[in-house]
From Swiss-Prot:
Gene name as annotated: coaE
Principal EC category: transferase
Pathway annotation: Cofactor biosynthesis; coenzyme A biosynthesis; CoA from (R)-pantothenate: step 5/5
Catalytically driven reaction(s): 3'-dephospho-CoA + ATP = ADP + CoA + H(+)
Native source organism of the sequence: Trichormus variabilis (strain ATCC 29413 / PCC 7937) (Anabaena variabilis)
Protein name listed in UniProt: Dephospho-CoA kinase
Top-rank taxon, per record: Bacteria
Amino acid sequence: MTQRIIGLTGGIATGKTTVANYLASAHHLPIFDADIYARDAVSLGSPILDAIAGRYGKEILLPDGSLNRPKLGEIIFQNQDERHWLESLIHPYVRDRFLKAIAESTSPILVLVIPLLIEVQMTNLVTEIWVVICSESQQLQRLMERNHLTLEQAQARINSQLSLKEKAAIADVVLDNSSSLESLLKQVDIALNFEL
């Protein structure tokens, strides 16, 4: 039997973490998360963090020398060229971590949580693409509440990714998170039990 590698993606604040947590807790699937790998990439003393400080100055660092994420976010979500520069450093690191995780896993089903799965051409790492969607107004509201952002800041982050409609068009499975949690989890169960 070939290994199923689910690429779990969706827009920012659509419910990817909810789905991933459910797949881990209810179905006991191994979850590998791009956001965790990306945080590792810029950890204290890493060459990528040094490059970021070299480009933006020491003001991009907190007093303990770690990355000031909100400050970096202000830069990269307002300037596409800066975002692309940062992604060119972080994404190869993240891809390598995924390749290592896949190679080392013996599980018949793996879940790779990759918010920018489609945008950064990592679809070749997975055997199926699951996209979590919700309404645009829900996405905006959730993001503003979760990250304590203004409307403009939240919209800039949403605009930095492909639209939910574009992602859904490429998906093997679309999980609609615009109603209840129960409905979302039922969709996950159905998708998991259906071999593509």
